[in-house]
């Protein structure tokens, strides 16, 4: 089989490439360039991020070592259009966007995958910790969680188009991270011990404030208020805060522990409250993408953030919205994040959280 592999320059995609070669596939590597090299050179990189010049160098070295052709694909324009600009808009709307999920849908498993398939490849592969398997229950191939639940990345794949699943391969999904590193080490791949990417690739210094400043937006301090309207402190720019956060702002009224309850962008206000007020009985989400056919109402488990606990829930689907009712209240349901829906370890799809229901 002819397989195009997204090669980031990290150990996961390197091992995915290696495993496919071992299986006898005809393989070519594709490496995305999301930003100009100068962008990373000018920034202080506090955490390991993907798509930097060093990643490009590593990807080329991996491909050369494994004896495969590599092509550098310029995705800067589509990346700005589909990831950076929406991220910026959503921050200013008071949302907490998920750029990695948008990148997966529109860039990696959108533009890049189309680019690969249009070259005549049979399938597209990456180093994601997830599995592609045929489901007897749903009568089609589905995405399942990776066996290493600590590294499972299925959440970030919740909104990719369902037809693409038939053409995807995730070789790493049946391994743990430790096993992947061991395979790389035994194969002599030089990135076997390379640090994992930790942050948003286009914010290498980890500062949303600096990102917005680079985009021509200066944040303004504002009031922190209670739901009753009492001013209890000051914030440093509402886009810096997310639901459930309890640090990073200046509280002038002591004696209580405050958590971010919400934001009012048009008034430049952050609303805080007690811990119990940031637990939610449900949510409304919009623009759902379903990988399988689902009824108008069904039971499943829902994940509202990558590291959140899965919550048993009843889901009601109506037109372009989804109403989710949890069995037990869930912490910090955050507008802009992805609600991913599972049947056991099978990913059913995902939607963008519009609002939490208390």
From Swiss-Prot:
Q: Which pairs are disulfide-linked? A: 103-201
Q: Where are the stretches annotated Interaction with tRNA? A: 151-153
> Where, in this chain's numbering, is ATP bound?
6-13, 32, 127
Alphabetically ordered keywords of this record = ATP-binding, Cytoplasm, Disulfide bond, Nucleotide-binding, RNA-binding, Transferase, tRNA processing, tRNA-binding
Name the top EC class.
transferase
Which reactions is this enzyme annotated as catalysing? S-sulfanyl-L-cysteinyl-[protein] + uridine(34) in tRNA + AH2 + ATP = 2-thiouridine(34) in tRNA + L-cysteinyl-[protein] + A + AMP + diphosphate + H(+)
List the active-site residues: 103, 201
Question: Which residues are listed as membrane-spanning?
Answer: none
Q: What does this protein do?
A: Catalyzes the 2-thiolation of uridine at the wobble position (U34) of tRNA, leading to the formation of s(2)U34.
User: So what family is this one in?
Assistant: Belongs to the MnmA/TRMU family.
Q: Can you say what this protein is called?
A: tRNA-specific 2-thiouridylase MnmA
Organism from which the protein derives: Thermotoga maritima (strain ATCC 43589 / DSM 3109 / JCM 10099 / NBRC 100826 / MSB8)
